[in-house]
Design a protein with these regions (language model features):
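Conserved N-terminal segment of class I S-adenosyl-L-methionine
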Residues: 1-69, 86-87, 119-120, 130, ...
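A short SAM/SAH-binding and catalytic strip from SAM-dependent methyltransferases
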Residues: 69-82
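Conserved beta-strand signature within the Rossmann-like core of class I S-adenosyl-L-methionine
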Residues: 96-105
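Short secondary-structure junctions
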Residues: 140-144
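Short, glycine-/aromatic-enriched active-site segment of Class I SAM-dependent methyltransferases
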Residues: 104-125, 130-131, 135-137
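A short, conserved alpha-helix within the catalytic core of class I
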Residues: 79-92, 103
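Histidine-centered active-site/metal-ligand motif
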Residues: 47, 78, 123
Length: 161
């Protein structure tokens, strides 16, 4: 049986993304985990979604193409080199496409030491609004904070020369 709480959690990313996507868009659920519910939500709404997860769907060849959207929910905090990985994924995003991220953001340096999110030993990379603004600038992306932990990066609609 599906966890309704998890469905609501992922809908905070899926619902606004679905409003942005063209019909029958092609996407990648990067780091989808063992039960790719977000991919299923997107597919039920007419989109094609490929899966990649280092442990559960390790077919890395699947992410050697371009996509209209890439989602990474509760993934970037687990990456040892998130800048490298996000840049690589960004190159696979078509012009006008969206990269949708979900991760808890650092509120302030003062609160970091007591933040519950750092207690998970698999969380090794942390982001703040400032970090994401920097990343967006580096990528040439339009940044949108959709919710407290839902971030969209939109690629410009033209290929660079």
């Amino acid at each position: 049986m599906e966890d309704e709480g998890y469905h609501r959690f992922l809908s905070r990313c899926a619902s606004p993304l679905l409003k942005e996507l063209s019909p029958a868009s092609e996407g990648l659920d990067f780091g989808c985990g063992p039960a790719p519910l977000l991919a299923r939500i997107l597919m039920e709404n007419g989109h094609r979604v490929e899966l990649f997860d280092r442990y559960y769907f390790p077919e890395y060849g699947a992410i050697k193409k371009d996509y209209d959207f890439i989602v990474a929910t509760e993934v970037v905090e687990h990456l040892a080199a998130p800048g490298d990985e996000l840049t690589r994924l960004w190159r696979q995003l078509r012009p006008g496409g969206f990269m949708a991220l979900m991760t808890k953001l650092v509120i302030s340096p003062e609160r970091f030491a007591s933040w519950h999110y750092i207690r998970d030993p698999t969380h090794i990379s942390f982001f703040s609004a400032e970090t994401l603004r920097w990343l967006a600038q580096e990528l040439g992306a339009e940044l949108q904070f959709v919710d407290s932990d839902v971030i969209f990066l939109k690629k410009s609609g033209v290929y660079p020369e």
